[in-house]
């Protein structure tokens, strides 16, 4: 098994695998300031809800490092500003808000200590978030493996692997576990337009792991489902409402509709940190809209005519009634979702 480490905090620098460059180039993006982390999240150097949360936590550590020599009052003001900036890097993934909330809580708790002690406390919390995510992913993988039958053909969307987390992955983590437990699985990976996370990232991870797979255009998925060639669908999540409505990469909703028509099990794999206990339904989830160039260009080359308008939401919401279950580190949540989600609070 090849270990993929999405990020590493070492000697006061956060090193991120630059996911914009994969699969053609394996490079690291160095973050030395919280502004670097803000940019990395916005520009999708790092992406995937759990990975964004962990990166933002280390962004807070970098902010403390930046302002270490400031007087306490200015230090705390600058830290509050950094927390606010990082919390707004991307709007849809709740793990970002969750991680910043944890870092803010630590800062509030230790604000009367020396600046150097505050820095150490923040670094300790960021490290906790990192290692908790890794452990959570491995727990989800083992739990999720229970729903994978031997010789299963699995369809997945976007990237939910090690690159979307600090390591191992969510939905792709379940796939990884099924493969290494000898279940002889086969994977179809959607290319996932417009950013092509499936083609660039998931396909790369599958090749690295030696997992049998084929890459498909997004428009092929419905035909495979109709023809009975898919046994189960596994996707990730960026935010889950109390009723089970799930925001995930654009195109997920479409898959869920076809899966429901043809009675194919449709599972969301996400840590409980992705559940937003403050919203009732998916209607309350803010959907990020991204640059038109993501649709009109590929790798900087224009593929659409000048003058055409573009609608480019990064996510859509899959209604809870289309979801078979939500696989978390605490077990599989099944309908009625609201009742069972509240038990985890």
UniProtKB/Swiss-Prot annotation:
Active site per the UniProt annotation: 238
UniProt GO BP: L-methionine salvage from methylthioadenosine
Positions of substrate binding: 47-49, 90, 197, 248-249
EC annotation from Swiss-Prot or TrEMBL: 5.3.1.23
Keyword Lyase listed: no
Superkingdom, taxonomy of origin: Bacteria
Any one GO MF annotation of this record: S-methyl-5-thioribose-1-phosphate isomerase activity
UniProt keyword annotations, A-Z: Amino-acid biosynthesis, Isomerase, Methionine biosynthesis
Residues marked Transition state stabilizer (site): 158
Enzyme class name: isomerase
Catalytic activity, reaction form: 5-(methylsulfanyl)-alpha-D-ribose 1-phosphate = 5-(methylsulfanyl)-D-ribulose 1-phosphate
InterPro entries: IF-2B-related, IF-M1Pi, IF_2B-like_C, Initiation_fac_2B_a/b/d, M1Pi_N, NagB/RpiA_transferase-like
Pathway linked to the protein: Amino-acid biosynthesis; L-methionine biosynthesis via salvage pathway; L-methionine from S-methyl-5-thio-alpha-D-ribose 1-phosphate: step 1/6
Record's function text: Catalyzes the interconversion of methylthioribose-1-phosphate (MTR-1-P) into methylthioribulose-1-phosphate (MTRu-1-P).
Family membership noted in the UniProt record: Belongs to the eIF-2B alpha/beta/delta subunits family. MtnA subfamily.
UniProt cross-references to HAMAP family, sorted A to Z: Salvage_MtnA
Record protein name field: Methylthioribose-1-phosphate isomerase
Naturally occurring in which organism (per UniProt): Caldanaerobacter subterraneus subsp. tengcongensis (strain DSM 15242 / JCM 11007 / NBRC 100824 / MB4)
Gene (UniProt): mtnA
């Amino acid at each position: 098994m090849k270990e993929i480490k999405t990020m590493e905090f070492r000697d006061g620098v956060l090193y991120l695998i630059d996911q914009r460059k994969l699969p053609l180039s394996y490079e690291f993006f160095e973050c030395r300031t919280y502004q670097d982390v803000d940019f990395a999240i916005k520009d999708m150097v790092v992406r995937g809800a759990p990975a964004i949360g962990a990166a933002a936590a280390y962004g807070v550590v970098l902010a403390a490092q930046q302002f270490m020599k400031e007087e306490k009052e200015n230090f705390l003001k600058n830290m509050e500003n950094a927390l606010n900036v990082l919390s707004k890097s991307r709007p849809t993934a709740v793990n970002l808000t969750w991680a910043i909330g944890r870092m803010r809580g630590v800062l509030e708790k230790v604000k009367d200590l020396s600046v150097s002690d505050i820095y150490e406390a923040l670094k300790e919390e960021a490290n906790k978030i990192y290692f908790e995510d890794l452990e959570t992913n491995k727990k989800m993988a083992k739990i999720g493996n229970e729903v994978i039958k031997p010789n299963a053909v699995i369809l997945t969307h976007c990237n939910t692997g090690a690159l979307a987390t600090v390591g191992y992955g969510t939905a792709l983590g379940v796939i990884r576990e099924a493969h290494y437990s000898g279940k002889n699985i086969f994977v179809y990976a959607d290319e996932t337009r417009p950013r092509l996370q499936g083609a660039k990232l998931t396909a790369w991870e599958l090749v690295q792991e030696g997992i049998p797979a084929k890459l498909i255009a997004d428009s092929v998925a419905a035909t495979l489902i109709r023809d009975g060639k898919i046994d189960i669908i596994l996707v990730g999540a960026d935010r889950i409402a109390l009723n089970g409505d799930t925001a995930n990469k654009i195109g997920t909703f479409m898959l869920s509709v076809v899966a429901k028509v043809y009675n194919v099990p449709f599972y969301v794999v996400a840590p409980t940190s992705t559940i937003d206990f403050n919203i009732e339904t998916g209607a309350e989830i803010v959907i990020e809209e991204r640059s038109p160039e993501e649709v009109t260009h590929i790798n900087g080359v224009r593929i659409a005519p000048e003058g055409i308008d573009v609608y480019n939401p990064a996510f859509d919401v899959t209604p809870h009634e289309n979801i078979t279950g939500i696989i978390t580190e605490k077990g599989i949540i099944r309908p009625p979702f609201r009742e069972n989600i509240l038990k985890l609070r």
